[in-house]
Amino acid sequence: MPAAEFDLIVIGAGPGGVAAADTAALLGKRVALVERTAAIGGAAVNTGTIPSKTLRETALAISGVKARALFGVDVSVRREAKVEDLLRHERLVTASESHQMRTLLDRYGVAVYRGTGTFLDPNTVRVAHPSPPGGVTDLRADKIVVAIGSVPMRPAVFPFESPRVHDSDELLYITAIPRSLAVIGAGVIGSEYACMFAALGVRVHLIDGRDALLPFLDPDLSNALKDAMEKQGIVFWWKDQVEACTAPRSGEIELRLASGNELAVDNVLVCAGRTSAAATLAPERAGFGVTPRGLIPVDEHFRTTVPHIYAVGDVIGFPALASTSAEQGRVAACHAFGSHAKEALAQFLPAGIYTIPEVSSVGLTEAQAKDKGIAVVVGRADYDQNPRGKIIGDKTGFLKLVFAREDLKLLGVHVIGEQASELVHIGLIAMMTGGDANLFLATCFNYPTLGDLYKLATHDAILKRAELVGKAQVGLSRW
């Protein structure tokens, strides 16, 4: 049977793949989307971003954490949370998001093929269908986008055959909330899950080979988050690693650490990074290669070494975020078909970390600016100085703005606290438009809102700058 002809084949229906498919379809192209699982959305929607953030909100709701912060007392009624309570809302949100993405693909006329895609040659992809067994469909296109995402790494030291030893994908299938949990890896995923389970009253041990929490963050945010996590009861094991893990059928799982310490816990969650399965695509038949980590090298347009084959998302490595993957997919599709609608990634890419408390940032940290030789002034506003912050009971959150000292142009925004991942967008848009301190002073924010923190932090920066440059008074138009 001859191959079905398309303008574009996309392999992988995560954020990057769906964005590429939708964009090409909107450009009037015939698009085929290949997805090995039954659900559209990839890891972001089905096992990663959306599920974990939904679980976080559920954990906060049923644990009474927010109520304790607001009223200063424990007003929670339910003392024992069941795993069904934790997962019910997650299942609904995940299914709804996946369905919505599929509905849009159908509306755009994208042909979706269920199965595993492999290259037969640089322009042909064979789809092996799960049902009926042995069924295949060959697809052919002038342009191809690879967006197969990533999978959790599984270090050999951990017995994943045990139902109580999980990677970050499998955690969604736990059958009971453990009394104690060891989280291996204090990266973004490990830290988020550690906070979530600690909120539910689980004794959490967080083990990491580094000596600092999320060192890519502004140090003030990293230190504040570490303090908050320790107050939740999370125990950190820094500069350490697991050398042995024994998981009997019953009883506690035993961990032996390189430091000589031993831990006994109910469950283990391994968050040791993610890797790609790009080698399973038979890339050699298409003419491009992969790195030892399974990543696909690309240029600034997300082209592989084969000019008509693109790769986006986790399969190309950092930053491996759902938001940036979608951006990459749009850029790749536009470049493939000569459209100028989206020629490059956004200049500034925000990061959101859904720990408890939430953390978000965009742009330069104070240290990064200084490394670039830029003299800076930093303004800070604490949530407990803001009426909205007081109303919601957030006593530890803060907003930190990094300005260029010379002209007070905004260079970076760093937030920790309630709604941090939303609040950062005010600064993000200001940076996208080249905004400076005057923008925030000229803006009228609703009252009371956390957005007003921008005005307070800007005042702080202006006063500090006045002290630095020796001015007793600073006029509104003379920054």
Name these PLM-found stretches:
Residues 9-37, 43, 50, 54-61, ...:
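Flexible, glycine-rich terminal cap/loop adjacent to redox cofactors
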Residues 9-11, 117, 138-149, 183-184, ...:
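Short hydrophobic core segments
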Residues 2-14, 177-187:
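Beta1/beta-strand and adjacent pyrophosphate-binding region of the FAD-binding site
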Residues 2-6, 23-29, 35-177, 210-214, ...:
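Glycine-rich flavin
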Residues 49, 148-203, 207, 235-236, ...:
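Glycine-rich dinucleotide-binding loop and its adjacent helix/turn
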Residues 76, 99, 111-114, 118-132, ...:
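A Rossmann-like FAD-binding core segment of flavoenzymes
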Residues 16-23, 43, 165, 190-193, ...:
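Short glycine/serine/threonine-rich phosphate/pyrophosphate-binding segments
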Residues 161-178, 262-340, 422, 426, ...:
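FAD-site-proximal beta/loop scaffold in flavoenzymes
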